[in-house]
A protein has these predicted regions:
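ATP/Mg2+-dependent ligation/transfer catalytic cores
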Residues: 1-134
Length: 134
């Protein structure tokens, strides 16, 4: 289901959400998270949440240290493993520079551009997840 920012904010207020994990992937496929409190969610949707990208391998070191995470409300999920009271939610994020330009090493932006370029050439994609256990 696709949620709007307003629906996410309402859900967080009504459902005893303790914090929200803003997720993104490095260029090496490693998932990273920045946790925010529910009180920071409106600001996250409006302006993004700053993080120190110099600590993320492949993001360019100190040259590109100040980047912003922009949560995508359509990716909202509840993480199932919190043992205490209160819920933990997660959203995947797009990454931008403070001036609003998309960060060129943001894997979500790279994928979106590739899908758009392929679509312009008449190619369509179908994506899915597969669970495997060994």
């Amino acid at each position: 289901m696709k949620y709007t920012p307003e629906e996410v904010i309402q859900f967080v207020q009504e459902e005893d959400v303790k914090f929200i994990r803003l997720a993104f992937c490095s260029v090496y496929g490693k998932q990273h998270n920045v946790a925010i409190m529910p009180s920071e969610l409106k600001r996250a949707f409006a302006y993004g949440i700053a993080f120190d990208a110099s600590a993320v391998d492949g993001f360019g070191g100190e040259i590109r240290s100040d980047l912003l995470l922009h949560p995508d409300p359509s990716t909202l999920i509840q993480l199932p493993w919190r043992p205490e009271q209160g819920k933990v939610m997660q959203m995947f994020c797009d990454i931008s520079y403070p001036d609003g330009r998309p960060f060129e090493r943001d894997t979500r932006s790279i994928l979106k551009r590739a899908v758009a370029d392929a679509g312009a050439r008449g190619v369509q994609f179908a994506f899915g997840a597969e669970m495997e256990f060994y």
